Amino acid sequence: MSEILQKITDPKEIKDLDEKELEMLAKELREFLIESVSNTGGHFASNLGVIDLTVALFKNFDFSENRIIWDVGHQSYAYKILTGRKDKFNTLRQYGGLCGFPKRTESEYDFFATGHSSTSLSSAAGMARAQKILGKDNKVIAVIGDGALTGGMALEALNDIGYRKDNLIIILNDNQMSICKNVGGLATYLNKLRMGVGYNKLKSDIGSTLDTTSLGKRVKNSLSKLKDGIKKIVVPSMYFEDIGLKYFGIVDGHNIRELNEVLSIAKSIKGPVIIHTVTKKGKGYELAEKNPNKYHGVSPFDLGEGVISKFANRNYSSTFGEEMIKLAKNDDKVVAITAAMPDGTGLKDFREEFPDRFFDVGIAEQHAVTLAAGMAAEGLKPFFAVYSTFLQRAYDQVLHDVCIQNLPVTLCLDRAGLVGEDGETHQGIFDISFLSPMPNMTIVAPKCIDEMEVILKWASNFNAPLAIRYPRGGDIDVNLKPLSKIEYGKWEKVQEGEKIAIVATGKMVQHAMIAAQKIKEEKNIDILIINATFIKPIDKELLNSLSKDGFKIVTIEDNIKKGGFGEGVLEYLNEIGHEEKIVTLAFNDKFIEHGKPDILYRINGLDAEGIKNTLIELL
């Protein structure tokens, strides 16, 4: 029963709660989240891990005046609940419902939208400097995980913050795991800090003893000059203080008393402060505590049974991983790279089988691309598996380090197209538009899962920059035969027809097949369907033939229209003087909100019914 949670109508009321009531509030929040997210799905383990911290933050700060930014933002559920959104929580990540990430248009308490990693420190520094220029004295708080802290942008911000002495508080939520196990030098450093309790205990014991006498206090002041030396002896390299941040840690992120104590001190300090808290992902739900990776993001599940595997059927990511293992067994030059997503991209088994040819660089997409370029320059065959939305972070590296040098790096763009419930920050609908203008870049897409094998095999012998884009999940129940071989720049006629030709990319071929079947049933007309295996270059020979034969042409893609595949086709058809109607079906110039993919495709006219209606208008 949520006795305290139920009564809270304003987050300011939390400041009046005593320690016991705060602990009860945290318990009730945990129970509510477990019940609610098990019904709606969402980010589960990470949110259970920060509940106590969230409660302590509200105890110490008034967020109608102060500012808080949640890095990535997937761990902001308790914050949303306590800022007036509890009654809407059953709509989480549903179309028209609550977003799974902070969103400025959703609440006055969401000060900065997040979704991608490692952005909080830069935005917090910007807010802190704005406060100073505007003559305000409010605190800005950034909550960042140990995984996000491995991102280059976060490290750049830390360096600048330490130099500028911004008046902000950084809370390092160290759960020893981002989505997958953290890697790299900073992760190793944080591990040493966690284990370096000797320094913290020594400092506390000496201070307590010396404070008992006036002489002791004078001695304590003198000894403070030795502080840096002691730290360097007992705790390895106090990185944060070396760059100019006041460091507090290690703090138990589930002990509200400890959190209150350190937050009350931190808010009185002028300048940058970092509070190092250690939390446990999945706290309060045993199955999530034991397997936080499995419970990172969940679909609705039964609390008694726990999460069943997300994809009972074959999916593109797992198939990619299987085929990569086959390639590596036959070619010792094949290497795999990922940016902190070995499980999500399907490379977990590859990592186990080929540890010397697997490189998880952490949240560092820019580094990953140029690392791949260096490998390619020396004759290796690097495959960089990355979610489409995250490749946006490495645009310059793809252009400058890969394409200009025409190096054979293969970019494997998982989650291309709609991802659904994660919303605007995660939809993979821009990659065709930002990759197509790059000289030397080739872009391909399988129309079905089985086609992944032939495309990857062909890719392993392709000697130029290449992007393979494929969607989240599996196929629609459509009977499609995979290509038996790849011919560069050539498209495939999947179904013969008359009057109208659909030219579709990737999984949209499946939508086109269903739409064409509806036309056949309703109008008894066969629609020509073409699988544009190559998004770039386009098959000019086939387009010439379609134009000569008088076909009306419909292009379909799960990318934005601006700069997309359809615009490229339209440009060429205009050049050759095509006289029949041309229709481009793609996402319009807007961000696509969160919701189930089926709903989003329907709203944007890209489901089978919407495609059918477009075809009927052309007949």
From Swiss-Prot:
GO terms for cellular component: cytosol. InterPro entries: Dxylulose-5-P_synthase, THDP-binding, Transketo_C/PFOR_II, Transketolase-like_Pyr-bd, Transketolase_BS, Transketolase_C, Transketolase_CS. Its cofactor is Mg(2+); thiamine diphosphate. Its EC number is 2.2.1.7. Mg(2+) binds at residues 146, 175. SUPFAM superfamilies: Thiamin diphosphate-binding fold (THDP-binding), TK C-terminal domain-like. Pathway: Metabolic intermediate biosynthesis; 1-deoxy-D-xylulose 5-phosphate biosynthesis; 1-deoxy-D-xylulose 5-phosphate from D-glyceraldehyde 3-phosphate and pyruvate: step 1/1. The keyword Transmembrane helix does not apply. GO terms for biological process: 1-deoxy-D-xylulose 5-phosphate biosynthetic process; isopentenyl diphosphate biosynthetic process, methylerythritol 4-phosphate pathway; terpenoid biosynthetic process; thiamine biosynthetic process. One of its GO terms (molecular function) is 1-deoxy-D-xylulose-5-phosphate synthase activity. Thiamine diphosphate binds at residues 74, 115-117, 147-148, 175, 285, 365. Pfam families: DXP_synthase_N, Transket_pyr, Transketolase_C. It is an enzyme of class 2 (transferase). Binds 1 Mg(2+) ion per subunit. Binds 1 thiamine pyrophosphate per subunit. It catalyses: D-glyceraldehyde 3-phosphate + pyruvate + H(+) = 1-deoxy-D-xylulose 5-phosphate + CO2. Keywords: Isoprene biosynthesis, Magnesium, Metal-binding, Thiamine biosynthesis, Thiamine pyrophosphate, Transferase. It comes from the Bacteria. Belongs to the transketolase family. DXPS subfamily. NCBIfam families: dxs, PRK05444.2-2. Catalyzes the acyloin condensation reaction between C atoms 2 and 3 of pyruvate and glyceraldehyde 3-phosphate to yield 1-deoxy-D-xylulose-5-phosphate (DXP). Homodimer. PANTHER family: 1-D-DEOXYXYLULOSE 5-PHOSPHATE SYNTHASE-RELATED, 1-DEOXY-D-XYLULOSE-5-PHOSPHATE SYNTHASE, CHLOROPLASTIC. This is 1-deoxy-D-xylulose-5-phosphate synthase.
